[in-house]
A protein has these predicted regions:
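ABC family nucleotide-binding domain
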Residues: 1-141
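H-loop (His-switch) and adjacent beta-strand-loop-beta switch element
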Residues: 138-150
C-alpha cells in the first residue's frame, strides 16, 4: 500500500487511544469527538458524538474544553472519539498510564465494555500485568521484537 492507501485504511478501519489523550485544546469535548467523523464525511457526526460521550459518562460535559476536564475525563473523551468512528481494530497505548488507580480501573472497564458492545478488536499496549491478564491473548515484546506468546 502507498502512503495515501495506508492513510485511508487507518481513517476507515483503525482507532487509536493515546496515553496523553491527543485532544485539541481549542475544541470542546464534543468537537474533539466530532472532528474525525466530520473529516470522514459522516452525516450524523454530532448525534453520534453526543451518544458516545454519554456512553462514557460525559453527556453533561459536552461543551467543556480539555483544560477544564480531569485526566480521566480527557481519557474518556479520547475513548469516545476512538469508538465513535466504528473502527474494526482499536489500538490503546497505555490507556491508564496517566491516571490514578480508581480512574484507571473505570477506564479499563469502559474499554472492555465498548470492545464487547461494538465488536471491535482491541489491542492494548501496557506495562500493567493486571490489565494484560484481562486480555484474551497476550504477547510480550523485548528489544522491539515479539518475544513470547502467552
Amino acid at each position: 500500500l502507498d502512503e495515501d492507501q495506508r492513510a485511508t485504511l487507518r481513517s476507515e478501519k483503525v482507532g487509536f487511544v493515546f496515553q496523553n489523550f491527543q485532544l485539541l485544546p481549542a475544541l470542546t469535548a464534543l468537537e474533539n469527538v466530532m472532528l474525525p467523523l466530520e473529516l470522514a464525511g459522516t452525516q450524523d457526526a454530532r448525534e453520534k458524538s453526543e451518544v458516545f460521550l454519554a456512553r462514557v459518562g460525559l453527556g453533561e460535559r459536552l461543551h467543556h474544553y480539555p483544560r477544564t476536564l480531569s485526566g480521566g475525563e480527557q481519557q474518556r473523551v479520547a475513548i469516545a472519539r476512538a469508538f465513535a468512528s466504528a473502527p474494526v481494530i482499536l489500538f490503546a497505548d497505555e490507556p491508564t498510564g496517566n491516571l490514578d488507580t480508581e480512574t484507571g480501573a473505570n477506564v479499563v472497564r469502559l474499554l472492555f465494555e465498548l470492545n464487547i458492545e461494538e465488536g471491535t478488536t482491541l489491542v492494548l499496549v501496557t506495562h500493567d500485568t493486571d490489565l494484560a491478564d484481562r486480555c484474551q491473548r497476550k504477547f510480550t515484546m523485548s528489544a522491539g521484537r515479539l518475544a513470547e506468546v502467552l
